Amino acid sequence: MDLISQNHNNRNPNTSLSTQTPSSFSSPPSSSRYENQKRRDWNTFCQYLRNHHPPLSLASCSGAHVLDFLRYLDQFGKTKVHHQNCAFFGLPNPPAPCPCPLRQAWGSLDALIGRLRAAYEENGGAPETSPFGSRSVRIFLREVRDFQAKSRGVSYEKKRKRVNNKQITQSQPQSQPPLPQQPQQEQGQSMMANYHHGATQ
């Protein structure tokens, strides 16, 4: 998983993002790694809002600004994402290098949004107004997951739990219908347009 905060500080010296927290927010030795990472991510996002032109307050932040932040982080990614016209598109282990861009892995972005949602609520934000839980962000993450899965030749589907054989024989011999796939959203397609073309801020 990509170390977003560390990469940001190492590769963008012109933007002074502080990963150090004030003494009042210093974590005790027993604080978990998750809490430390969540604090760093929150500080990075708040600094991003302050460096925005014009600067943004947290109250005025929307899902669109969160998407801009995620695209901005792509420049610090370490995951090779092949274009559709690349000869290695869909190959999990390419035999040679290619000029396709490095991006943030879907798993990193998904975990990041989860931490930012939690931090937003811990800092007084209401869950129903959280920009990190907006529909546009959910669509974007789903599109990134699907495209990276095809591009890298990997599967992000969760493994289904094995069902006990006794339960199968005792239950009625009928198969459940497949879940209907959610139709493609035009909004999701427009949000992924910049992603496919490697646009970053």
Curated annotation (Swiss-Prot):
Species name: Arabidopsis thaliana
User: A GO CC term?
Assistant: nucleus
Question: Which family is annotated?
Answer: Belongs to the plant homeotic and developmental regulators ALOG protein family.
Biased composition range(s): Low complexity: 15-32
Q: What does this protein do?
A: Probable transcription regulator that acts as a developmental regulator by promoting cell growth in response to light.
Q: Give the protein's recorded name.
A: Protein LIGHT-DEPENDENT SHORT HYPOCOTYLS 2
GO terms of biological process kind: mRNA transcription; post-embryonic plant morphogenesis
Gene this chain is encoded by: LSH2
> What are the UniProt keywords, alphabetically?
Developmental protein, DNA-binding, Nucleus, Transcription, Transcription regulation
The domain of life is Eukaryota
Residue ranges with Polar residues bias? 1-14
Q: Which InterPro entries does the entry link to? A: ALOG, ALOG_dom
Residue numbers of motif Nuclear localization signal? 158-162
Cystine pairs: none
Q: Where is this region: Disordered?
A: 1-37, 151-201
> Per its record, what are the GO molecular function terms?
DNA binding
Q: Where is the ALOG domain?
A: 33-160
Q: Is Coiled coil there in the keyword field?
A: no
Subcellular location per the Swiss-Prot or TrEMBL entry: Nucleus
